[in-house]
């Protein structure tokens, strides 16, 4: 099927919130529980995100970078202390709401410019 005129196709990035929420949950009694971050143990996620970002250019929705706190750590909790992901891969409703607040929707849905003229 052909793409409809004025239709915008976007690449949507990968996500990774550590290897197991149990690692975070076991520290639930600590004072800084909600400040914990998770390590991205598989660097392939970061490389894949970089490759897709380069390939898709302005038509890429990067979900990994906004969650990163440094080169290989990501947030686990939203600003209101709710889990972003229940299983380290899929978003909780709170995680989806967090992304809805932080992503630049005006930029994502701006009118598409032709790649080649």
Placement of each model-derived feature along the sequence:
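Extracellular glycan-modifying ectodomains
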Residues: 1-117
């Amino acid at each position: 099927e052909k793409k409809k005129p004025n239709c915008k196709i976007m690449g949507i990035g990968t996500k990774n919130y550590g290897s197991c929420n149990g690692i975070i949950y076991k520290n639930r009694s600590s004072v800084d529980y909600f400040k914990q971050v998770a390590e991205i143990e598989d660097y392939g996620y970061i490389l894949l995100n970089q490759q897709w970002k380069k390939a898709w250019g302005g038509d890429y929705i990067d979900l990994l970078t906004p969650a990163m706190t440094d080169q290989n750590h990501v947030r686990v909790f939203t600003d209101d202390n709710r889990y972003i992901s229940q299983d380290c891969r899929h978003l909780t409703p709170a995680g989806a709401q967090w992304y809805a607040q932080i992503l630049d929707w005006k930029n994502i849905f701006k009118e598409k410019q032709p790649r080649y003229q």
